[in-house]
Curated annotation (Swiss-Prot):
Compartments in which it is found: Cytoplasm
GO CC, one annotated term: cytosol
InterPro entries, alphabetized: PurM-like_C_dom, PurM-like_C_sf, PurM-like_N, PurM-like_N_sf, PurM_cligase
Family: Belongs to the AIR synthase family.
Alphabetized NCBIfam families for the sequence: purM
Biological pathway: Purine metabolism; IMP biosynthesis via de novo pathway; 5-amino-1-(5-phospho-D-ribosyl)imidazole from N(2)-formyl-N(1)-(5-phospho-D-ribosyl)glycinamide: step 2/2
Species: Actinobacillus pleuropneumoniae serotype 5b (strain L20)
Coiled-coil portions: none
Gene that this sequence comes from: purM
Protein name as annotated: Phosphoribosylformylglycinamidine cyclo-ligase
EC number: 6.3.3.1
Length: 345
């Protein structure tokens, strides 16, 4: 038996580094603050009041990660935008139900805490919260020796929002004749990255040095996920939105049916837009079928919105004013017997 005195640091956990990180991120956290938030960092739990404007407030919650986009970001030493991806994946899922995001928490786990890297990641999380009007109220930084390879870390996010009970968007109002609008994506967002990494492997591409349309391939593939919260909330105020689908894992085939009644079918016109260069590159280099592309990737479409034809002009104007690239991508029809709920023509 050794007489050597052991400390937590000897076991690989540096409490000082954790405290240093907290000090580093205080400014980032502060800029996301909402008036409903009570107290600051350091409490055992974060306190947040409900906004007073809601008569029958319904809380909406979500949790997500960024998948293996994180592997690519780590490999390319690009840590400052993956946090925005994390927030986007959560808040975009909330806003499709009409909810305004209130607060966000993150979980950051690593084998050895590298303060500079973690601070970059959390700055990105704060950026995402600021873009979506959501308060970063806390999180957990877990330093776990022996659990991760050197330099690796993992991320998860948790978000809570609120919506007026009478204004929940659940797809039940969708009917034949509704028009479908598309909101452009900023790239692959945070889905399909295991296939993206496989394409990089089999093609021998180097994302850091290879270029596509005049900029590094890495910029196309690591472009931060677009956050649609403020644009969509503005649209909901001015148009009769029947349903919104966030195109994440499962692509067109799986996400659009999630917001359709069992009797409805979405008909998508693929001639209405051109795939961005990154998706053409992926399909060509990976020899990926059209069906698989639409199942795995958003192919340039971040959200699909169903609304009555009478509201289309207003909706397009509102979205343009909000800085979105939006267009008519299809329509809703009655579902025929033996037919699929999504048809891409």
């Amino acid at each position: 038996m050794s007489n050597t005195q052991l400390s937590y640091k000897d076991a690989g956990v540096d409490i000082h580094a954790g405290n240093e990180l907290v000090e580093r991120i205080k400014g980032d956290v502060k800029r996301t603050r909402r008036p409903e938030v009570m107290g600051g960092l350091g409490g055992f739990g974060a306190l947040c009041a409900l906004p007073t404007k809601y008569k029958e407030p319904i809380l909406v919650s979500g949790t997500d990660g960024v998948g293996t986009k994180l592997r690519l970001a780590i490999d390319l030493n690009k840590h400052d935008t993956i946090g925005q991806d994390l927030v986007a994946m959560c808040v975009n899922d909330l806003v499709v139900q009409g909810a305004e995001p209130l607060f966000f928490l993150d979980y950051y786990a690593t084998g050895k805490l590298e303060v500079d890297v973690a601070a970059d990641v959390i700055k990105g999380i704060a950026d995402g919260c600021e873009i979506s009007g959501c308060a970063l109220v806390g999180g957990e930084t877990a330093e776990m020796p022996g659990m991760y390879h050197e330099g690796d870390y993992d991320l998860a996010g948790f978000c809570v929002g609120v919506v007026e009970k009478s204004e929940i968007i659940d797809g039940s109002a969708v009917k034949a004749g509704d028009v479908l609008l598309a909101l452009a994506s900023s790239g692959p967002h945070s889905n399909g990255y295991s296939l993206i990494r496989k394409v990089i492997e089999v093609s021998g591409a180097n994302p850091a040095t290879d270029t596509l349309e005049g900029k590094p391939l890495s910029e196309h593939l690591l472009a931060p996920t677009k956050i649609y919260v403020k644009s969509v909330l503005q649209l909901i105020k001015q148009a009769d939105v029947h349903a919104i689908a966030h195109l994440t894992g499962g692509g067109f085939w799986e996400n659009i049916p999630r917001v359709l009644p069992a009797t409805a079918k979405a008909v998508i016109d693929e001639k209405s837009w051109e795939w961005p260069a990154a998706f053409k590159w992926l399909q060509e280099k990976g020899n990926i079928s059209r069906y698989e592309m639409y199942r795995t990737f958003n192919c340039g479409v971040g959200m699909v919105i169903a609304l009555p034809e009478k509201d289309i002009e207003t909706a397009l104007a509102v979205l343009k004013q909000a800085g979105e690239n939006a267009w008519v991508i299809g329509k809703i029809e009655n579902l025929g017997e033996g037919s699929e709920q999504v048809e891409i023509i």
